[in-house]
Amino acid sequence: MAHFMKPSFSAMLIAVTVLAVSPLHARKKVTQPDPNFAATYPDDPRPEVVPNGAIFQPSYGYMPIISGARASHVGDMVTITLVESFAASKSANTTTSRSGGASIIPPTTGPLSFFKATDATASSSHNFKGTGTTGQSNSLSGEITATVARVFPDGTMLIRGEKIMTINRGDEHIRISGLVRPWDIDGTNHVLSTRIGDARISYTGTGDVARASRMGWLGHFFQMISPF
């Protein structure tokens, strides 16, 4: 009877394999868009305005004579050209030095005459040198199309957009939001990311590649508690 209750090695191996593979399937989930960067759709069709003969028609928005149509209303699309590039460096160098000394001439007569001059000298010195250097650089290029979420009275527009790309076994997320002035948009309805005010740009990834680039939970735990 005891022989049948004792688990075999193959059964234990199968159980361990199932437990190891199960978390991988549990972590797999469908990528959902971020509602904070959701597209804004155009409002209901605006009522038709009868031209009054003036050259400038407010209902047409910002449309220069020598260029094509540009985004100017809620729901309009605008393409952002990402040209982000940053580089920073910092270095520090500190050197200190300190020394001191003292000497006492002992008596040569009387009960303390057995001291020698070398027995009553003291000196100290301290030196310190520290050097530190740090540097960081980042760059991001490409294009993403966003929609106008809000138009302010002065014509400035709040834009936001998100792009999700599924490549093999991973997802790439590009999100952007910020303020754009109408005159910063060129004739092809493009605007540079460097011309976006209060810009929020993020580029993240999920999936097997992103998971492999992160430290494991056990290694992260020991790194947190390590005093070195």
Swiss-Prot record:
It is found in: Cell outer membrane; Bacterial flagellum basal body. Residues 1-26 form the signal peptide. One of its GO terms (biological process) is bacterial-type flagellum-dependent cell motility. The keyword Magnesium does not apply. GO terms for molecular function: cytoskeletal motor activity. The keyword Signal applies. It comes from the Bacteria. GO terms for cellular component: bacterial-type flagellum basal body, distal rod, L ring; cell outer membrane. Its main location: membrane. Pfam families: FlgH (PF02107). Belongs to the FlgH family. Assembles around the rod to form the L-ring and probably protects the motor/basal body from shearing forces during rotation. The basal body constitutes a major portion of the flagellar organelle and consists of four rings (L,P,S, and M) mounted on a central rod. This is Flagellar L-ring protein. It comes from Zymomonas mobilis subsp. mobilis (strain ATCC 31821 / ZM4 / CP4).
